[in-house]
């Protein structure tokens, strides 16, 4: 049995933490400084983690490699199993042009460009985040806004800032699923706390968006529908993440936000010509004026309706218990690890939820979607294989980063860093979202930041007497605010609207909002760690 040691380097916690942090530092420097491709940076960091575990911590090489293999397998199933199937559903709607029908349907909710920004970037973007993630919401929302006549820079900035509130539950809950796994905390517990943090951002972001579109006038004239949209989004995200399913949080929130905009009379008032003239300075696409049969509009919404129904049914206690029976649990081969206290760690056992996992439920929704929107079985299979091919580098990135995280967690590297960081004491609650923000700003992924920093956040929380669930959630909630400034997302936004090479211009425009909202999140977490806002936690 391998027993984790907290101070393997010269008996010093500080030196040990410095060595333990090397894999993380290497990944972040390669991504943010050298601008190396993410999958190569992940593999390099994994190699560093293996060497540190073996040479500095004395973990047997066989167990080190086995822990990395477990992380890679978890990356494939359930994480990438969810992502692949969700993106597959999206690709089928694109192939049949039902995606175009859906975006035209959203675009017709109002002719006011400020409301259109909310509908497309905030609500429709959240719907895309729920299924596709990985930069797709920013690219597609920005292109749609340009097609409406938005100036490219304004469209890109709006799309970037809007892609915040839904990120923690994106790709059918992938970030929080990863966070729960690497920390050993129950998914429901982690998701419920995240669902009491990011909805507070959702209250603010729509107001920020109308300001970005039309300044003080936009805020003065459209604050009522913007606030209604934010409140509906926040309530739905909170309710889904706490009482239904984390995987449904973004879908429910997106539809609720759009529904609120439809329900508020002020959102349907035509914009003054002076507003349209000052905001819509680009060229409008004629494609947006096409008329779609009501039957096809219903079919365009069908994939999302099917996902909501299937996930909701899966949460009914008898059904949930029946699905859970197929879960396979077994001791992971060549792995026998104990914590510093000599007790076996949870990582020795691997759980494989074959049927109840979100990816399998999305696969079922995808099969039904293919039938509803008229995709032949052979074409559906080709699209699924094409999805895997499209994600090949993302697959390598996710598996390498999760392998790295598992090596660090099981060797004791994460525990060492966590004990060292715990010295921050009460200030840890303020710094916790900053760590997640930094991780996403560099990696471009809330999932990666949760995999890298989730375990050390929990260790630090336990050592400092704070709630592990609170700091784990803060890592993800703070991380969503780093996405708008990540080089990956800036590049995607620039490419989508034809601003190649102008990432710096976008960064200067979104950085103040990223930092300002991060400060708000830090204060929320500090408040939740004290009696001031502690009542908000479950």
Residue ranges of each PLM-predicted region?
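Structural signature of hydrophobic alpha-helical transmembrane segments
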Residues: 8-22, 75-79, 131-137, 188-203, ...
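Juxtamembrane and boundary regions of transmembrane helices in multi-pass small-molecule transporters
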Residues: 168, 172-278, 477-538
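Transmembrane helical segments that form the transport core of multi-pass membrane transport proteins
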Residues: 290-435
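Structural signal for alpha-helical transmembrane segments and their membrane-water exit/capping regions
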Residues: 15-16, 27-63, 84-96, 264-270, ...
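Active-site loops and adjacent core secondary-structure elements that bind or stabilize anionic groups
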Residues: 238-326
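Alpha-helical transmembrane segments of multi-pass membrane proteins
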Residues: 114-126, 152-165, 188-206, 399-400, ...
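Short helix-coil transition sites and intra-membrane helix breaks within transmembrane domains
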Residues: 77-79, 90-97, 127-137, 165-172, ...
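Hydrophobic alpha-helical transmembrane segments of multi-pass integral membrane proteins
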Residues: 112-143, 147, 167, 395-407, ...
């Amino acid at each position: 049995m391998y027993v984790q040691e907290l101070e393997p380097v010269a008996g010093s916690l500080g030196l040990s933490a410095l060595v333990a942090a090397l894999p993380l530092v290497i990944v972040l420097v390669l991504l943010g400084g050298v601008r190396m491709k993410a999958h190569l940076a992940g593999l390099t960091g994994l190699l560093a983690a293996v060497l540190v575990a073996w040479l500095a911590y004395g973990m047997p090489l066989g167990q080190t490699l086995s822990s990395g293999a477990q992380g890679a397998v978890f990356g494939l199933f359930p994480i990438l199993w969810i992502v692949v199937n969700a993106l597959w559903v999206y690709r089928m709607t694109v192939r049949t042009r039902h995606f175009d029908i859906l975006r035209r349907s959203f675009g017709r909710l109002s002719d006011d460009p400020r409301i259109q920004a909310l509908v497309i970037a905030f609500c429709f973007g959240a719907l895309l985040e729920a299924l596709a993630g990985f930069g797709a919401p920013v690219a597609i929302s920005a292109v749609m806004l340009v097609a409406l006549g938005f100036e490219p820079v304004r469209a890109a900035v709006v799309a970037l800032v809007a892609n915040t509130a839904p990120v923690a539950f994106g790709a059918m809950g992938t970030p929080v699923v990863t966070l729960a796994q690497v920390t050993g905390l129950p998914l429901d517990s982690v998701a419920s706390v995240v669902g009491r943090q990011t909805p507070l951002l959702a209250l603010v972001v729509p107001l920020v968006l109308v300001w970005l579109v039309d300044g003080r006038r936009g805020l003065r004239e459209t604050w009522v529908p913007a606030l209604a949209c934010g409140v509906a989004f926040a309530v739905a995200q909170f309710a889904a993440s706490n009482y239904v399913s984390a995987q449904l949080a973004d879908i429910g929130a997106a539809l609720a936000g759009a529904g609120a905009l439809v329900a508020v009379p002020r959102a349907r008032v035509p914009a003054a010509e002076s507003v349209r003239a000052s905001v819509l300075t680009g060229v409008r696409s004629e494609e947006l004026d096409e008329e779609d049969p009501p039957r096809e509009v219903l079919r365009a919404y069908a994939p999302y309706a099917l996902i909501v129904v299937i996930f909701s049914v899966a949460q009914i206690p008898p059904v949930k218990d029946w699905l859970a029976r197929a879960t396979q649990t077994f001791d992971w081969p060549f792995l026998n690890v104990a914590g510093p206290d000599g007790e076996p760690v949870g990582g020795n056992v691997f759980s494989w939820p074959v049927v109840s996992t979100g990816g399998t439920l999305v696969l079922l929704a995808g099969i039904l979607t293919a039938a509803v929107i008229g995709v032949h079985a052979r074409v559906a299979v080709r699209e699924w294989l094409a999805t895997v091919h499209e994600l090949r580098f993302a697959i390598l990135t996710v598996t390498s980063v999760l392998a790295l995280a598992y090596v660090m967690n099981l060797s004791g590297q994460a525990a060492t860093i966590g004990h060292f960081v715990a010295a921050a004491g009460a200030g840890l609650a303020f710094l916790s979202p900053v760590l997640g923000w930094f991780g996403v700003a560099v990696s471009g992924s809330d999932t990666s930041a949760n995999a890298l920093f989730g375990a050390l956040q929990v260790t630090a929380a336990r050592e400092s007497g704070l709630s592990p669930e609170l700091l784990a959630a803060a890592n993800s909630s703070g991380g969503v605010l780093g996405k708008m400034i990540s080089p990956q997302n800036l590049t995607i936004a620039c490419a989508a609207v034809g601003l190649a090479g102008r990432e710096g211009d976008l960064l200067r425009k979104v950085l103040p909002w990223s930092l300002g909202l991060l400060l708000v999140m830090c204060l929320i977490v500090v408040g939740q760690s004290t009696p001031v806002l502690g009542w908000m936690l479950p």
